[in-house]
């Protein structure tokens, strides 16, 4: 009997939106590694030379095929581009909708157009072209209300009436649409990671390492907050476990799951491990920034944004995310998706640090940062 996450990829034809991104690109590779016949990558961002090479290598190694639709051909905001993706093969077996507008620095209209309307376009074409499975990449931020999350299950975290960020609000709207669309002809599920990391990450770890390398990062508050983290391979595995769990009468239908590495980690501790490994100054040797001070400054920044329209990097949402506990139970994903992490944090975090030391650090220094840190 196939292991969970390995059955649906075998011989499948899949669409992966967001295929030039951190998660989407790794999902494309892992689908081929698990026997997919063809993966249609869809992303408004064109693959860079490194990703082009990665895709060439995995195709040679597996015999699978990758069709890349990028630029105007990979635009979620274009009705014609989205529909064209569904015509690239006689039958699409599964759609993995990963693409999203992320971060706190965009306006409501853009978030809605990409994260909500883009999702509606995927749903409409799944129906039109009789795609039987849709796996939606959601976010735990769709459940955040501002307080600590300590070991909760997904069923203990309903979607709130108000949201901490536009990203969360529009991702939640997309998720609701995906679940509403679930029927015998189109089976759907939502799977979210928490704090995804790994090689080729361009957001989470590099941004924090850059700030630390310039000597601008301090521990927020006491620095004892714990979080769940998710290695990128574990998340892609969770998405494929989600696809495996899409069958009639499955408990996973129209349901939301969070997957991660397992036991929670002290956020500032593991981040400091990465910082020290890069040769940067140990955060524990610097004074901590008091939480109340940070919140006061963040609210002033938010008021400044309200007055001027200029967006600052420090805002109440980002401060809160770096100070609260954010860790989740795996119980539901283990039961319904048969998900188990491929690697633990103890295995995957050191691998990731080593990758950044070898691949990211030299490039960062070449950009004129060699005398910093």
Where do the language-model regions lie?
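N-terminal Rossmann/SDR dinucleotide-binding element
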Residues: 1-94
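Catalytic helix-loop patch of NAD(P)-dependent Rossmann-fold dehydrogenases
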Residues: 113, 148-196, 217-220, 225
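Mid/C-terminal beta-alpha module of Rossmann-like enzyme folds, strongest
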Residues: 245-313, 350-351, 363-373
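Conserved C-terminal active-site "lid" loop/helix of NAD(P)H-dependent oxidoreductases
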Residues: 232, 239, 299-340
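Amphipathic terminal alpha-helices
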Residues: 2-7, 13, 328-336, 340, ...
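NAD(P)H-binding glycine-rich loop region in Rossmannoid oxidoreductase-like domains
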Residues: 62-117, 121, 125-128, 142-146
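Substrate-positioning beta->alpha
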Residues: 169, 173-174, 201-207, 221-245, ...
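Conserved Rossmann-fold NAD(P)-dependent oxidoreductase catalytic core, especially the SDR/UDP-sugar
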Residues: 97, 121-167
């Amino acid at each position: 009997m196939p292991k969970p996450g390995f059955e649906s990829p075998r011989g499948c034809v899949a669409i992966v939106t967001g295929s030039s991104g951190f998660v989407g690109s790794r999902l494309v590779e892992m689908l081929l590694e698990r026997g997919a016949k063809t993966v249609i990558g869809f992303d408004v961002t064109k693959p860079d030379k490194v990703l082009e090479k990665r895709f060439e290598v995995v195709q040679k190694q597996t015999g699978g095929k990758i069709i890349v639709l990028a630029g105007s051909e990979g635009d979620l905001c274009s009705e014609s581009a989205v529909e064209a993706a569904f015509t690239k093969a006689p039958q699409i077996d599964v759609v993995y909708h990963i693409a999203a507008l992320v971060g706190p620095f965009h306006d409501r209209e853009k978030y809605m157009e990409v994260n909500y309307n883009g999702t509606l376009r995927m749903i409409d074409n799944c129906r039109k072209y009789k795609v039987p499975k849709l796996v939606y990449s959601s976010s735990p931020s769709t459940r955040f209300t501002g307080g600590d999350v300590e070991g909760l299950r997904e069923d203990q975290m309903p979607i709130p009436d108000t949201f901490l960020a536009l990203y969360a609000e529009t991702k939640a709207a997309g998720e609701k649409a995906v679940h509403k669309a679930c029927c015998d002809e189109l089976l759907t599920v939502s799977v979210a990671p928490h704090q995804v990391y790994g090689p080729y990450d361009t957001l989470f770890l590099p941004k924090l390492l850059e700030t630390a390398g310039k000597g601008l990062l301090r521990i927020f508050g006491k620095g004892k907050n714990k979080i769940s983290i998710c290695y990128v391979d574990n998340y892609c595995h969770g998405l494929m476990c989600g696809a495996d769990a899409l069958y009639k009468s499955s408990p996973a239908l129209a349901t939301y799951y969070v997957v991660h590495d397992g036991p929670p980690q002290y956020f500032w501790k593991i981040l400091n491990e990465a910082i020290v490994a890069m040769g940067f100054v140990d955060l524990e040797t610097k004074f901590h920034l008091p939480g109340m001070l940070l919140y006061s400054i963040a609210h002033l920044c938010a008021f400044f944004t309200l007055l001027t329209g200029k967006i600052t990097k420090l805002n109440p949402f980002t401060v809160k995310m770096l100070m609260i506990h954010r860790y989740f139970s795996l119980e539901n994903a283990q039961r319904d998706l048969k998900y188990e992490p491929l690697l633990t944090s103890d295995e995957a975090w050191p691998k990731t640090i080593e990758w950044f030391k070898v691949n990211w650090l030299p490039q960062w220094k070449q950009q004129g940062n060699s005398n910093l840190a």
